């Protein structure tokens, strides 16, 4: 039930994203134009998810900066280290929970990263192993235990991601022609949802959680594959039954013809 809820939430979030506003209408960018340029290329802006005020407070469309930053507008300016995770958690609650419970979670340690260390602040991109790997090496030496653990996590997730895509592709090809297989489509969605939970677990580098969610994803894929196996077995059985029936008809027709002669 939890996994189904996650899938429904992800669908709702994707459906709720709107077209972004014109950055020329955002007064903040008139002065902070470099930040505005970076933000306009981010996934946050391009998917219409947030604007300047969601992290900095204030009134983003107010040209008078005194009014835009006035008391009561929630203006905080540049968030402090202690505020960053909480701000991101307004949307990324699960990620924040994993992060704060992981090895990097103590923001008071200046050597520890914050959300923007890996994801940037304005130029936020979809997270990828390549993007994050470049950040890890800022603190961790190549070949260190920490990087080796990260490499194992990346390998596990990549392998499972390929599995999900392979099963999804095969099922998408067959399902339009085989109504019975359409019932297997949600299984792949659940597998994808479990994989997303595993990816979220990377914020805390929780290898046990990641392994458990990957296994959960794999179990759903096996169910989907079993549905396809059962479908083809049933199809072969039906073909044999049809062939036997036709043979029976042919034999009876032949016997009738012989008797008439």
Regions picked out by a protein language model, each given a short descriptive name:
Residues 259-261:
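Alpha-helical transmembrane anchor segments
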Residues 16-257:
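Short sequence/structural segments immediately N-terminal
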Residues 1-9:
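Sec-dependent signal peptide recognition
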